[in-house]
């Protein structure tokens, strides 16, 4: 049985696609080894995966003296760990999903002449992936017009989309004509602080206007804001569920008519897979502003709506929600556009693995 290393860390956006591919590869008879870092360890709780998992202790590089020295020591230690992992497991192929956690594994893969594939979830190629373009067998991407991709490597590009976990591979049947309207608020794997005030204040305006909808809110909030957000919805007499992370996120999508969310890679792949109409508010300081490009890719396809954080206010958000609540035909057509964007990314990426596996 051939071993495949899947590596990615830092955020759920790098981890969850690796898990999704791991599920597909296991079904094809591969031995899967998932490598991530301590920042992603919390996302593995309450999930039961049968493949091996290794958690690396990675730290970001600081500009201050002692912290910078410590960071370099940790990076060196990670490279040694990477050497041991590659040497002892002899993977046939490495698939890297971004984040600087990939570096120690890819470097050792190059050292041992193990082929590797890069996967970019965002519409802008990340720094870690750019570092290893020259040596990669293939560069798999979500968007055909991915930015920051040097023309000399365009021949390596394969459009696969971003894999999503099995639990998220279905299309819900939503009744957009229902007067029971559920709104899903998600800030990505790390939550979003601005939503903790923006959304409740928009809902306050919604409650005070004339309509005949029963509104339910499912809100993923930053942990320290949970009590505040709950209190706001309670005061408004709005049925709500608030948590810092939903392990059963598929159920939340399934029962929601509209989402308000960031535009990270994982979120984008999930709303496409589940055909979830969404108002996208890109994180303004995301690396290379990739979330804005992600959101525009959705909006340009009329598969969602993009409102930049610099312009959004509770009143603007309220008006958008209110308009969409009263426009079931528009929500249904948006859902249809998302259906048209769906591709079987897990299968396509696994096919690339099959192609480049060492025989």
UniProtKB/Swiss-Prot annotation:
Q: Which InterPro entries match?
A: GlcNAc_MurG, Glyco_trans_28_C, GlycoTrans_28_N
Which CDD domains does the entry mention?
A: GT28_MurG (cd03785)
The GO cellular component terms are: plasma membrane
- Which amino acid positions bind UDP-N-acetyl-alpha-D-glucosamine, per UniProt? 11-13, 122, 165, 189, 291
Q: Which SUPFAM superfamilies match?
A: UDP-Glycosyltransferase/glycogen phosphorylase
Q: Which domain of life is it from?
A: Bacteria
Which biological process annotations from GO are given for this protein?
A: carbohydrate metabolic process; cell division; cell wall organization; lipid glycosylation; peptidoglycan biosynthetic process; regulation of cell shape
| Pathway(s) per entry | Cell wall biogenesis; peptidoglycan biosynthesis
- Give a yes or no for keyword Cell inner membrane in this entry: yes
Membrane topology per record: Peripheral membrane protein
UniProt catalytic activity: di-trans,octa-cis-undecaprenyl diphospho-N-acetyl-alpha-D-muramoyl-L-alanyl-D-glutamyl-meso-2,6-diaminopimeloyl-D-alanyl-D-alanine + UDP-N-acetyl-alpha-D-glucosamine = di-trans,octa-cis-undecaprenyl diphospho-[N-acetyl-alpha-D-glucosaminyl-(1->4)]-N-acetyl-alpha-D-muramoyl-L-alanyl-D-glutamyl-meso-2,6-diaminopimeloyl-D-alanyl-D-alanine + UDP + H(+)
| Chief place of localization | membrane
> Where does the UniProt annotation locate this protein?
Cell inner membrane
**Which EC number(s) does UniProt give?**
2.4.1.227
Q: Name one Pfam family in it.
A: Glyco_transf_28
One MF term in the entry's GO annotations: UDP-N-acetyl-D-glucosamine:N-acetylmuramoyl-L-alanyl-D-glutamyl-meso-2,6-diaminopimelyl-D-alanyl-D-alanine-diphosphoundecaprenol 4-beta-N-acetylglucosaminlytransferase activity
Specify whether Cell wall biogenesis/degradation is a keyword of the entry. Answer: yes
Which keywords does UniProt give here? Answer: Cell cycle, Cell division, Cell inner membrane, Cell membrane, Cell shape, Cell wall biogenesis/degradation, Glycosyltransferase, Membrane, Peptidoglycan synthesis, Transferase
Task: Please give the PANTHER family that the UniProt record associates with this protein.
Answer: GLYCOSYLTRANSFERASE, UDP-N-ACETYLGLUCOSAMINE--N-ACETYLMURAMYL-(PENTAPEPTIDE) PYROPHOSPHORYL-UNDECAPRENOL N-ACETYLGLUCOSAMINE TRANSFERASE 1
The job of this chain, per UniProt, is described as: Cell wall formation. Catalyzes the transfer of a GlcNAc subunit on undecaprenyl-pyrophosphoryl-MurNAc-pentapeptide (lipid intermediate I) to form undecaprenyl-pyrophosphoryl-MurNAc-(pentapeptide)GlcNAc (lipid intermediate II).
| Protein family (similarity comment) | Belongs to the glycosyltransferase 28 family. MurG subfamily.
Specify the protein name: UDP-N-acetylglucosamine--N-acetylmuramyl-(pentapeptide) pyrophosphoryl-undecaprenol N-acetylglucosamine transferase
Q: What is the lineage of its organism?
A: Bacteria, Pseudomonadati, Pseudomonadota, Alphaproteobacteria, Rickettsiales
Which gene is the coding source of this polypeptide chain?
murG
